[in-house]
Protein backbone atom coordinates (compact mmCIF):
# COMPACT_ATOMS: atom_id res chain seq x y z
CA UNK A 1 0.00 0.00 0.00
CA UNK A 2 1.23 3.50 -0.83
CA UNK A 3 0.44 6.77 0.97
CA UNK A 4 -1.66 9.06 -1.24
CA UNK A 5 -3.00 12.03 0.75
CA UNK A 6 -4.49 13.34 4.01
CA UNK A 7 -8.14 14.36 4.30
CA UNK A 8 -10.68 15.15 7.01
CA UNK A 9 -11.79 12.12 8.99
CA UNK A 10 -15.07 10.54 7.88
CA UNK A 11 -17.20 8.01 9.79
CA UNK A 12 -15.99 4.53 8.97
CA UNK A 13 -12.33 5.50 8.41
CA UNK A 14 -9.81 3.18 10.06
CA UNK A 15 -8.64 4.94 13.22
CA UNK A 16 -5.24 3.29 12.80
CA UNK A 17 -4.68 5.58 9.82
CA UNK A 18 -5.30 8.79 11.77
CA UNK A 19 -2.73 11.51 11.02
CA UNK A 20 -2.20 12.80 14.54
CA UNK A 21 0.21 15.54 13.49
CA UNK A 22 -2.29 17.17 11.11
CA UNK A 23 -5.09 16.56 13.61
CA UNK A 24 -3.17 18.39 16.33
CA UNK A 25 -2.24 21.26 14.00
CA UNK A 26 -5.74 21.86 12.66
CA UNK A 27 -7.77 20.86 15.71
CA UNK A 28 -9.89 18.58 13.52
CA UNK A 29 -9.44 14.82 12.97
CA UNK A 30 -7.66 13.87 9.76
CA UNK A 31 -6.85 10.47 8.33
CA UNK A 32 -4.27 9.19 5.85
CA UNK A 33 -5.47 7.67 2.60
CA UNK A 34 -3.58 4.88 0.90
CA UNK A 35 -3.85 3.31 -2.50
CA UNK A 36 -2.78 -0.09 -3.66
CA UNK A 37 0.42 0.23 -5.63
CA UNK A 38 -0.71 -1.54 -8.77
CA UNK A 39 1.41 0.25 -11.37
CA UNK A 40 5.04 1.24 -11.46
CA UNK A 41 6.22 4.84 -11.90
CA UNK A 42 6.66 6.24 -15.40
CA UNK A 43 9.54 8.69 -15.64
CA UNK A 44 10.62 10.94 -18.49
CA UNK A 45 13.92 12.51 -19.44
CA UNK A 46 13.07 15.20 -22.00
CA UNK A 47 15.83 17.18 -23.73
CA UNK A 48 14.85 20.71 -24.79
CA UNK A 49 18.41 21.98 -25.18
CA UNK A 50 19.96 24.14 -27.94
CA UNK A 51 20.31 21.36 -30.52
CA UNK A 52 16.59 20.60 -30.14
CA UNK A 53 15.67 24.17 -31.18
CA UNK A 54 15.75 23.19 -34.84
CA UNK A 55 13.13 22.18 -37.36
CA UNK A 56 12.32 22.53 -41.05
CA UNK A 57 9.10 20.48 -41.13
CA UNK A 58 6.02 20.98 -38.97
CA UNK A 59 7.80 21.95 -35.73
CA UNK A 60 11.07 22.21 -33.86
CA UNK A 61 12.48 18.99 -32.44
CA UNK A 62 11.89 20.38 -28.95
CA UNK A 63 8.17 20.81 -29.70
CA UNK A 64 7.87 17.29 -31.12
CA UNK A 65 9.67 15.90 -28.07
CA UNK A 66 7.23 17.76 -25.81
CA UNK A 67 4.24 16.50 -27.80
CA UNK A 68 5.44 12.92 -27.60
CA UNK A 69 6.18 13.19 -23.88
CA UNK A 70 2.78 14.77 -23.22
CA UNK A 71 0.96 12.00 -25.10
CA UNK A 72 2.84 9.32 -23.19
CA UNK A 73 2.21 11.11 -19.90
CA UNK A 74 -1.54 11.33 -20.58
CA UNK A 75 -1.56 7.60 -21.39
CA UNK A 76 0.30 6.90 -18.15
CA UNK A 77 -2.20 9.00 -16.22
CA UNK A 78 -5.13 7.11 -17.80
CA UNK A 79 -3.39 3.86 -16.86
CA UNK A 80 -3.17 4.93 -13.22
CA UNK A 81 0.64 5.26 -13.29
CA UNK A 82 2.63 7.86 -11.40
CA UNK A 83 4.40 10.45 -13.55
CA UNK A 84 7.69 12.22 -12.95
CA UNK A 85 11.17 12.75 -14.34
CA UNK A 86 13.47 15.52 -15.54
CA UNK A 87 12.98 18.16 -18.23
CA UNK A 88 16.26 19.83 -19.14
CA UNK A 89 17.59 22.47 -21.50
CA UNK A 90 21.36 22.41 -21.46
CA UNK A 91 22.51 23.22 -17.94
CA UNK A 92 19.01 24.13 -16.74
CA UNK A 93 16.69 21.41 -15.54
CA UNK A 94 13.50 20.80 -13.62
CA UNK A 95 13.18 17.62 -11.58
CA UNK A 96 9.74 16.20 -10.78
CA UNK A 97 9.08 13.45 -8.26
CA UNK A 98 6.62 10.79 -9.47
CA UNK A 99 3.05 11.50 -8.40
CA UNK A 100 -0.32 10.01 -9.25
CA UNK A 101 -2.96 11.40 -11.57
CA UNK A 102 -3.08 15.20 -12.04
CA UNK A 103 -0.55 15.76 -9.26
CA UNK A 104 2.03 14.15 -11.49
CA UNK A 105 0.67 15.01 -14.92
CA UNK A 106 0.03 18.75 -14.61
CA UNK A 107 3.45 19.80 -13.20
CA UNK A 108 5.10 17.69 -15.90
CA UNK A 109 3.09 19.35 -18.69
CA UNK A 110 3.89 22.77 -17.21
CA UNK A 111 7.61 21.95 -17.21
CA UNK A 112 7.40 20.96 -20.89
CA UNK A 113 5.98 24.42 -21.65
CA UNK A 114 8.18 26.46 -19.31
CA UNK A 115 11.44 24.87 -20.48
CA UNK A 116 10.81 25.32 -24.21
CA UNK A 117 13.55 27.34 -25.96
CA UNK A 118 12.75 30.98 -26.65
CA UNK A 119 14.63 33.08 -29.17
CA UNK A 120 18.08 32.07 -30.37
CA UNK A 121 19.80 29.65 -28.02
CA UNK A 122 23.60 29.75 -28.38
CA UNK A 123 25.34 26.41 -28.57
CA UNK A 124 26.77 25.41 -25.22
CA UNK A 125 30.35 24.33 -24.77
CA UNK A 126 30.93 21.04 -23.01
CA UNK A 127 28.47 18.22 -22.48
CA UNK A 128 28.92 17.40 -18.81
CA UNK A 129 25.24 18.19 -18.20
CA UNK A 130 24.33 14.89 -19.90
CA UNK A 131 26.40 12.95 -17.38
CA UNK A 132 24.90 14.88 -14.48
CA UNK A 133 21.30 14.55 -15.71
CA UNK A 134 21.55 10.80 -16.32
CA UNK A 135 23.20 10.35 -12.93
CA UNK A 136 20.39 12.30 -11.27
CA UNK A 137 17.74 10.22 -13.00
CA UNK A 138 19.47 6.92 -12.26
CA UNK A 139 19.70 7.89 -8.58
CA UNK A 140 16.06 9.01 -8.34
CA UNK A 141 14.34 6.20 -10.22
CA UNK A 142 13.05 3.21 -8.33
CA UNK A 143 13.98 -0.23 -9.74
CA UNK A 144 11.26 -1.60 -12.00
CA UNK A 145 10.18 1.78 -13.37
CA UNK A 146 9.33 2.57 -16.97
CA UNK A 147 11.61 5.32 -18.31
CA UNK A 148 11.31 7.30 -21.54
CA UNK A 149 14.29 9.27 -22.89
CA UNK A 150 13.38 11.83 -25.58
CA UNK A 151 16.25 13.66 -27.28
CA UNK A 152 18.29 13.99 -30.44
CA UNK A 153 21.16 12.66 -28.26
CA UNK A 154 23.63 15.12 -29.77
CA UNK A 155 26.54 15.76 -27.43
CA UNK A 156 25.96 12.55 -25.49
CA UNK A 157 29.50 11.79 -24.23
CA UNK A 158 31.04 8.36 -23.73
CA UNK A 159 31.22 9.11 -20.00
CA UNK A 160 27.41 9.03 -19.86
CA UNK A 161 27.28 5.34 -20.72
CA UNK A 162 27.95 4.27 -17.13
CA UNK A 163 24.90 6.18 -15.88
CA UNK A 164 22.85 4.95 -18.83
CA UNK A 165 23.82 1.37 -18.02
CA UNK A 166 22.89 1.86 -14.38
CA UNK A 167 19.52 3.28 -15.40
CA UNK A 168 18.77 0.44 -17.82
CA UNK A 169 19.98 -2.34 -15.52
CA UNK A 170 16.87 -2.41 -13.33
CA UNK A 171 14.31 -0.47 -15.37
CA UNK A 172 12.45 -0.71 -18.67
CA UNK A 173 14.02 2.09 -20.73
CA UNK A 174 12.67 3.37 -24.05
CA UNK A 175 14.96 5.77 -25.94
CA UNK A 176 13.31 7.96 -28.59
CA UNK A 177 15.65 9.77 -30.99
CA UNK A 178 14.01 12.95 -32.35
CA UNK A 179 15.32 14.23 -35.67
CA UNK A 180 14.46 16.55 -38.53
CA UNK A 181 14.45 15.12 -42.08
CA UNK A 182 17.06 17.68 -43.14
CA UNK A 183 19.43 16.15 -40.58
CA UNK A 184 19.04 12.70 -42.13
CA UNK A 185 19.57 13.71 -45.76
CA UNK A 186 21.01 16.86 -47.30
CA UNK A 187 18.52 19.24 -48.92
CA UNK A 188 18.47 19.62 -52.74
CA UNK A 189 21.65 20.86 -54.40
CA UNK A 190 22.38 24.43 -53.41
CA UNK A 191 24.21 26.65 -50.94
CA UNK A 192 22.55 26.96 -47.54
CA UNK A 193 23.58 29.36 -44.75
CA UNK A 194 23.75 27.73 -41.32
CA UNK A 195 24.15 29.11 -37.81
CA UNK A 196 24.18 27.72 -34.27
CA UNK A 197 23.57 31.17 -32.79
CA UNK A 198 27.28 31.96 -32.56
CA UNK A 199 28.98 30.65 -35.68
CA UNK A 200 27.95 30.86 -39.33
CA UNK A 201 28.76 28.56 -42.24
CA UNK A 202 27.55 27.70 -45.74
CA UNK A 203 26.56 24.15 -46.68
CA UNK A 204 27.15 23.34 -50.35
CA UNK A 205 24.99 20.29 -51.14
CA UNK A 206 25.80 20.56 -54.83
CA UNK A 207 29.04 18.73 -54.04
CA UNK A 208 28.29 14.95 -53.99
CA UNK A 209 31.09 14.37 -51.50
CA UNK A 210 29.54 16.85 -49.08
CA UNK A 211 26.07 15.32 -49.52
CA UNK A 212 27.38 11.81 -48.84
CA UNK A 213 29.33 12.93 -45.77
CA UNK A 214 26.25 14.76 -44.52
CA UNK A 215 24.07 11.67 -44.82
CA UNK A 216 26.69 9.35 -43.34
CA UNK A 217 27.18 11.63 -40.34
CA UNK A 218 23.56 11.28 -39.30
CA UNK A 219 23.52 7.53 -39.97
CA UNK A 220 26.62 7.07 -37.81
CA UNK A 221 25.07 9.08 -34.98
CA UNK A 222 21.79 7.15 -35.16
CA UNK A 223 23.59 3.81 -35.26
CA UNK A 224 25.79 4.76 -32.29
CA UNK A 225 22.74 5.64 -30.16
CA UNK A 226 20.98 2.45 -31.26
CA UNK A 227 24.06 0.39 -30.37
CA UNK A 228 24.24 2.04 -26.93
CA UNK A 229 20.61 1.14 -26.31
CA UNK A 230 21.00 -2.44 -27.49
CA UNK A 231 24.11 -2.97 -25.35
CA UNK A 232 22.06 -2.22 -22.27
CA UNK A 233 18.68 -3.63 -23.24
CA UNK A 234 16.98 -0.29 -23.93
CA UNK A 235 14.34 -0.20 -26.66
CA UNK A 236 15.20 2.28 -29.44
CA UNK A 237 12.77 4.34 -31.54
CA UNK A 238 13.21 7.17 -34.03
CA UNK A 239 10.70 9.99 -34.49
CA UNK A 240 11.03 12.52 -37.31
CA UNK A 241 9.50 15.97 -36.95
CA UNK A 242 7.55 15.26 -40.16
CA UNK A 243 5.92 12.08 -38.81
CA UNK A 244 2.54 11.94 -37.04
CA UNK A 245 3.49 11.63 -33.38
CA UNK A 246 0.65 9.40 -32.05
CA UNK A 247 0.81 6.84 -34.87
CA UNK A 248 4.62 6.66 -34.87
CA UNK A 249 4.76 6.14 -31.11
CA UNK A 250 1.99 3.57 -31.22
CA UNK A 251 3.75 1.49 -33.89
CA UNK A 252 7.09 1.64 -32.12
CA UNK A 253 5.70 0.85 -28.69
CA UNK A 254 3.65 -2.08 -29.96
CA UNK A 255 6.92 -3.65 -31.11
CA UNK A 256 8.44 -2.89 -27.70
CA UNK A 257 5.41 -4.33 -25.92
CA UNK A 258 5.93 -7.67 -27.69
CA UNK A 259 9.41 -8.09 -26.23
CA UNK A 260 9.57 -10.65 -23.39
CA UNK A 261 9.11 -8.95 -20.02
CA UNK A 262 8.39 -5.52 -21.48
CA UNK A 263 5.51 -3.37 -20.29
CA UNK A 264 4.95 0.08 -21.62
CA UNK A 265 2.47 2.91 -21.89
CA UNK A 266 0.89 3.37 -25.30
CA UNK A 267 -0.85 6.60 -26.36
Where do the protein language model's features map onto the residues?
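Exposed, interaction-prone extracellular/peripheral surfaces
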Residues: 8-13, 22, 31-67, 74-267
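Sequence-level motif detector for i,i+2 pairs with an aromatic at +2
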Residues: 1, 15-17, 189
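N-terminal low-complexity, intrinsically disordered segments
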Residues: 16-26
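Intrinsically disordered, low-complexity, positively charged segments
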Residues: 1-7
Amino acid sequence: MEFEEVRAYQPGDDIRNMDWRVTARTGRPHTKLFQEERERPVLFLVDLGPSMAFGTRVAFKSVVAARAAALLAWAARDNGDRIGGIVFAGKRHRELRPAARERGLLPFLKALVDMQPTGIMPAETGNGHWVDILRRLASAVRPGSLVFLLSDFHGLPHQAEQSFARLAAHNDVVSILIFDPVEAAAPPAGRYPLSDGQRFAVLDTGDPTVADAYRNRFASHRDAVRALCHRHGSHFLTLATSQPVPETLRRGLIVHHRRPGARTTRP
